[in-house]
Amino acid sequence: MSKSLKKKSHWTSKVHESVIGRNPEGQLGFELKGGAENGQFPYLGEVKPGKVAYESGSKLVSEELLLEVNETPVAGLTIRDVLAVIKHCKDPLRLKCVKQGGIVDKDLRHYLNLRFQKGSVDHELQQIIRDNLYLRTVPCTTRPHKEGEVPGVDYIFITVEEFMELEKSGALLESGTYEDNYYGTPKPPAEPAPLLNVTDQILPGATPSAEGKRKRNKSVTNMEKASIEPPEEEEEERPVVNGNGVVITPESSEHEDKSAGASGETPSQPYPAPVYSQPEELKDQMDDTKPTKPEENEDSDPLPDNWEMAYTEKGEVYFIDHNTKTTSWLDPRLAKKAKPPEECKENELPYGWEKIDDPIYGTYYVDHINRRTQFENPVLEAKRKLQQHNMPHTELGAKPLQAPGFREKPLFTRDASQLKGTFLSTTLKKSNMGFGFTIIGGDEPDEFLQVKSVIPDGPAAQDGKMETGDVIVYINEVCVLGHTHADVVKLFQSVPIGQSVNLVLCRGYPLPFDPEDPANSMVPPLAIMERPPPVMVNGRHNYETYLEYISRTSQSVPDITDRPPHSLHSMPADGQLDGTYPPPVHDDNVSMASSGATQAELMTLTIVKGAQGFGFTIADSPTGQRVKQILDIQGCPGLCEGDLIVEINQQNVQNLSHTEVVDILKDCPVGSETSLIIHRGGFFSPWKTPKPMMDRWENQGSPQTSLSAPAVPQNLPFPPALHRSSFPDSTEAFDPRKPDPYELYEKSRAIYESRQQVPPRTSFRMDSSGPDYKELDVHLRRMESGFGFRILGGDEPGQPILIGAVIAMGSADRDGRLHPGDELVYVDGIPVAGKTHRYVIDLMHHAARNGQVNLTVRRKVLCGGEPCPENGRSPGSVSTHHSSPRSDYATYSNSNHAAPSSNASPPEGFASHSLQTSDVVIHRKENEGFGFVIISSLNRPESGATITVPHKIGRIIDGSPADRCAKLKVGDRILAVNGQSIINMPHADIVKLIKDAGLSVTLRIIPQEELNSPTSAPSSEKQSPMAQQHSPLAQQSPLAQPSPATPNSPVAQPAPPQPLQLQGHENSYRSEVKARQDVKPDIRQPPFTDYRQPPLDYRQPPGGDYSQPPPLDYRQHSPDTRQYPLSDYRQPQDFDYFTVDMEKGAKGFGFSIRGGREYKMDLYVLRLAEDGPAIRNGRMRVGDQIIEINGESTRDMTHARAIELIKSGGRRVRLLLKRGTGQVPEYGMVPSSLSMCMKSDKHGSPYFYLLGHPKDTTNPTPGVLPLPPPQACRK
C-alpha cells in the first residue's frame, strides 16, 4: 500500500513557470488576490485575454497559486508586499505557479497545520510562509513576558480568554501549546504598522535571515547566549509558533524545530526557495538545523524493526508495520513514552487520543487504540476520577460479607408513587454534546436507571439540578421505571438537537455500586490487535472444528467437588437465598446436559496485554478477585463479567489481596501473552445471576423437564445454557463476544442428528481430524483481476464457506491447489468456520490491500473407494446459490443416490393416477442463473400422488431463463434432473446436480394442472401455514436418509420417539439459482481511517443523544429479550421461504418493519408485539426478510409503500418471508425523518416501531415524545 501511495505524483510536479513582461501599457495583464491578511496564499485573479505579454513558459491560469516571483518566495506575504516585490523586479518576470488541489489550496491555515517530514518540500515551504508572516505580524502568547522581552515586538502578551476569542474568531493562522502556554500567529494587517514597515527591505535575493529583516525574539536570543548550557532553559526559550520553536497542534505529536540551532539563534546561511523538483537536496541543507539532542525530537529516534513512515496524498503521516501488514496513524515510538491520562497536562492528550472539532456534534475525543469516542476530555476525566478516588469515603459501613465497592441493591418498584426520596423535575435542551449526562442501570428488568455522571459544561451541568445517583422516573410524561438501558437510550436519541425534554427525577437512591471505589481498580483497555489470541478452553488452544470443540468440552468439565475446601466459602448470590445455585451463565460452558445445575467450570484464557493494559476491571469479592467489567471485548476473548480469577501465569491469586492482584497484572509486560485460569459458575456465582435454568424453561415447551432428566442423551451437543440469550430475563442477549445462539443451535442440531442410531449414508467420522479430510495451505498473490476464485456459502449463520468457481487464468487457477468445493477454514490465520459470507468477504478485502492471502482449506478424500458426500455441508443446511457453470464440488458423484437414466420412469407411487409428465429444457447464459426455486418436502406426509414426488417448483424469478422458457409453473413437481431420478434424493444433492448441469438443464415434471384435484396439495405460494410436529429427534438429517435402494420412501420410515411436540412451519428446503459475483476488492484505499472523514465503526461522535457513559463505550447492552419467544430458537431451523397469513387484531397485526428503498436496504421484521397476531401465529420471527406483501414483490419497494400495502389489505395480510438470523440489519445512517412511537407492555418494557417518514403519520399518540409526529403503532 505504501508503494502505491508513493507513486502518486506530489503537487510540486505540477508547478510550472511563466516568463512574462509588461505590456505596452506597463501592465502585467492579470489581477492578484488572496494574501496573508486574508489567511490565503497569493493567487491569480482574472487573467485578461491578450493583455499578458508572454515570453516563454506556460500560460497563466486564473485561481492558480503564486509561489515565487523571480525566485523570491511570496507565500505568506500580504498582497501589498507581493506587489512591492513585483514592482521592484525588472522584466522579464519569472512566475512560479501551481494549480490548487490536494493539500495545497488557498487556505494558509489548512496548509500550516499539516505535518511533514523535515527536509521535505512541504516542510520547507511551511518555514518560508512562517518567516514571511513574521515580517508583518507579531506572535501572541499567554505566558508572562520575560526580562528583556519587548511587548509588541517579541510577543503580544494576552490572557487565555483573549487568546480563545482570537482563536474562535478565526484571527489566528496557527495556534498551539508549549510548556502549558498558548501560542498563536495572528493574520497580518493589510497595511503594515510603522514599526514593521520593511517593504523596502523585501528585495529579490533577501531572505528571512538577511540583515535588516525582523528576527524573532532578538532580545531573547541575545540574553540566552551567555547561558545556553541548561537544556531546560534552551527548551523553554524556544518559540512555539514563531518559526523558530516547537509547534504542538491538536493534530501534531512531533516537537518540530523550526530552523533553530541549539543556541536558539537563527542560522546565518541563506534560506533559499524550495527546490520543487528535487526535495532530497534540501535534506543536506537542513543538517545544521537539527537539534543536537536526540531526545528533543521523536523523529531522531529510529522506528522499530520493519516499520516505515509514509504520507497520504494530503501529506498526513502514517506508519506501516510490515510485520503484521497493517497501518496506523499512531507513531510507535511514542508508545514507549506514553503517560497515563491522569499524568498528562490539561492541554495535552494521552497517546492514541485525538481531539475533533465537528461543526455538527461539537468537540469530542477519539481513542484510536480502543476505537471509541467520548465528549469528555480524557485527561480531565481521569483527573476527576483520581480526585474522587482520593476523597475520604464515609459510606464504608457495609455488611461484613459484602464485597468492597458494592452496595446493597435498593428495593425496586415500577410504581412511581412508591419511590422513597425527593422528586424534582427539570427541562434539558439537547445540544451538540447531547444532554450532558451519562446513565447506568437498566441491565436487568428490575433495576433503576440512574445518572452516573454529569458532564462538565453540558446542558445538565449548566442547568444545575441533576446529580449523580438520581433515578430517572419520567421522560416527557412516559414512566421509564423498568425500561431497559437500550430503550431509554433510544428515547434520548430520538430527540433532535435543539429540542427539549422534560425529566422527573427521584433523589435518594445510591448507585448499585460505587464506580469510583478504589477497590474496583481498572486494568486499562487493550490496544486493538489485528488477530486476537485464541481462547484456551480446558488447557487447549483453538479446536479444529466446532464439532471437535463440542465433543471434547462436553466431557471435560471439572466438578466442583475437586476444588480445595477453602474455595467453597461462598454466599448465595442475590435472589438465591434458599441456598440453590444457578448453572454456569456463559456460552463457553458446554457441559453435559445431565451434569446438573451445580456444575462449575475452570477455563484457561490467554490475553495479550496492550499498550493501555488488558481491557477489563476487577473488584474484590468474598471469594477473591472477580472480573467486574469487560472494557475491550475483542481484547478479552472468552472472559466474562463475574469470572473469578484463580491463577495468573501459573501463580495462584485466590488468597491474595486486591492490591496484590492488581500489581501482578501491572507487572505483566506489554505485548506478551498472559495466561489466566478463571472459575465460572457453580458455587462461585457472580453477583448478578440469572434465574435458575429450570425456571426459565418452564411453560416454554422445553425439550426436557429437568436439567438432569434421563430422557436426554448424554451426548446432547447443546446444553440449555447455550440458549441463554433468548430467556426473558437475560441481560446479555446477543452479546457480540459470545457465539450467536441461532448459529449454535444449527450446528448443535446437525451434530445431534448425525449421532442418531440410523445407518449413516457414509462412514466418515464427525471429527475433522480424521483421515477422511485433508487440510492444505494455499498462498495466493493478488493479480489485477483479484485472487481468481469465488466464495460461496455463509448466507446464514452456520453454513460452511466454500470455494466456488476458480476463474480461468486467475491467481488461484495458476496456483492449481485450490479446487471448487473446498471448505475454507482460515483466512490469514483467522478462523472462518461458521462465519457469515460478509465477514469472509471483508477478510478477503483486507488481504487484497496487502496483495496476498494465506488460505487454509479442507478437502474430503475418498472414503473406502466411495465418493464422499458434498464437501463441508452440515446436515440440514441448504446451498442457496448457484454461482458458476463450473462444478462447485469436484470430487462428488451422484452414484450413491440413483443410477443415471436417460429415461427415468415415474415411481410407483403415482402410476395409478395416470399423471402426464413432460420434459422442460432451460438454457441460461454464462452470467445468470436458471432462476427457479425448488422446495423439498421430504419429511412432510402428503396425500395422493405427491407422496412420492416431494420436490416442486416454489418460485420463478421474473425475467430469468426459467421465466423466459414459459414451460415451468409454480407448483410443478420435479421427477428427474438431466434424466436422473431425484425422488429420494436429498435437497442439497439436487442443488449440486443442477449446479453441475452447466448452461442447460432438463427437468422432468408433473405439471401443476395435473395435480389440481381434491387430493393434491396447493401450490407453494398459496399454502396456508400448517401445524407440524418437529423435534431434533424427529427430523432426519440428509446423512440419515436411506439409499434409493430402500423400497420405501423416507417419509414412510417409522419416526424415532418424540419427547417434544412443537408448532412450527413447513419443514421444507428451498434453494434459489442465482449468480454470485467474484471477489474484486478495492486496494486503492490508504490507511484504515481518515482524519477528515471518520469512518462509522468508531470515529463517530459519541452520539447525538447525550454523552454516553463508559459502559456504553465498551459493553454492548442487549435488547429486551422478552420480545423473542424462547420456542423460536428451539424449533428446527431451515432458513426457508414461507408464507404467513394473519388476521388483524384489536391493536393491529402486531409486528413492525424496518428498511425500504429509501434506506438502501431490504424490508425486515423489526419487532413482534407481545400477544399480537404475529407472535400468536408462531411463524414470523424478528429478522425475517419480507419478500412479498399481499402478492406484490418488495424488491425496490419503499418503506411507505410497504405500510400502504399492509393497510390496504384490510383485516388480512399475506406475507412471503425468508427466514432470517434473528437479528435485524442496521441502517447505514438512520434518517432523522424516521418517526417513533412507543407502547409499554405489562412489564413496562417498551416496543419501538420504526415506521417511515412523517408523511405517513397519523394523529400523535398521547404520552409519546413530542418530536417528529409519531406514526400509529398498528399495521
UniProtKB/Swiss-Prot annotation:
Q: Where is the composition biased (Polar residues)?
A: 699-708, 1010-1040
Record flagged with keyword Transit peptide: no
Boundaries of every Guanylate kinase-like domain copy? 109-283
Q: Where is the composition biased (Basic and acidic residues)?
A: 280-295, 1067-1083
Q: Domain WW spans what residues?
A: 301-334, 347-380
According to the record, the residues making up region (Interaction with DDN) are 301-380
Q: Where in the cell is it found?
A: Cytoplasm; Late endosome; Synapse, Synaptosome; Cell membrane
What topology does it adopt in the membrane?
Peripheral membrane protein
According to the lineage, what is the superkingdom? Eukaryota
Alphabetical list of SMART domains matching this protein? GuKc (SM00072), PDZ (SM00228), WW (SM00456)
Tagged with keyword Transmembrane: no
A GO cellular component annotation in the UniProt record: photoreceptor inner segment
Pinpoint the PDZ domain residues. 17-101, 425-509, 604-682, 777-859, 919-1009, 1139-1221
What is known to happen upon mutating residue 1152 to A?
A: Does not affect interaction with USH1G
Phosphotyrosine modifications at = 361, 826
- Per the UniProt entry, what are the Gene Ontology biological process annotations, in alphabetical order? cellular response to nerve growth factor stimulus; clathrin-dependent endocytosis; negative regulation of activin receptor signaling pathway; negative regulation of cell migration; negative regulation of cell population proliferation; negative regulation of phosphatidylinositol 3-kinase/protein kinase B signal transduction; nerve growth factor signaling pathway; neuroligin clustering involved in postsynaptic membrane assembly
Annotated PROSITE patterns: GUANYLATE_KINASE_1, GUANYLATE_KINASE_2, PDZ, WW_DOMAIN_1, WW_DOMAIN_2
Annotated GO molecular function terms are: activin receptor binding; beta-1 adrenergic receptor binding; phosphatase binding; signaling receptor complex adaptor activity; SMAD binding; type II activin receptor binding
- Summarize subunit and interaction data from the UniProt record for this chain: Interacts (via its WW domains) with DRPLA. Interacts (via its second PDZ domain) with PTEN (via unphosphorylated C-terminus); this interaction diminishes the degradation rate of PTEN. Interacts (via guanylate kinase domain) with DLGAP1. Interacts (via the PDZ domains) with GRIN2A, GRID2 and NLGN1. Interacts with CTNND2, CTNNB1 and MAGUIN-1. Interacts with ACVR2A, SMAD2 and SMAD3. Part of a complex consisting of MAGI2/ARIP1, ACVR2A, ACVR1B and SMAD3. May interact with HTR2A. Interacts with RAPGEF2. Identified in a complex with ACTN4, CASK, IQGAP1, NPHS1, SPTAN1 and SPTBN1. Interacts with DDN.
* Family the entry assigns: Belongs to the MAGUK family.
Summarizing the function annotation, the protein's role is:
Seems to act as a scaffold molecule at synaptic junctions by assembling neurotransmitter receptors and cell adhesion proteins. Plays a role in nerve growth factor (NGF)-induced recruitment of RAPGEF2 to late endosomes and neurite outgrowth. May play a role in regulating activin-mediated signaling in neuronal cells. Enhances the ability of PTEN to suppress AKT1 activation. Plays a role in receptor-mediated clathrin-dependent endocytosis which is required for ciliogenesis.
Q: What is this protein called?
A: Membrane-associated guanylate kinase, WW and PDZ domain-containing protein 2
Naturally occurring in which organism (per UniProt):
Mus musculus
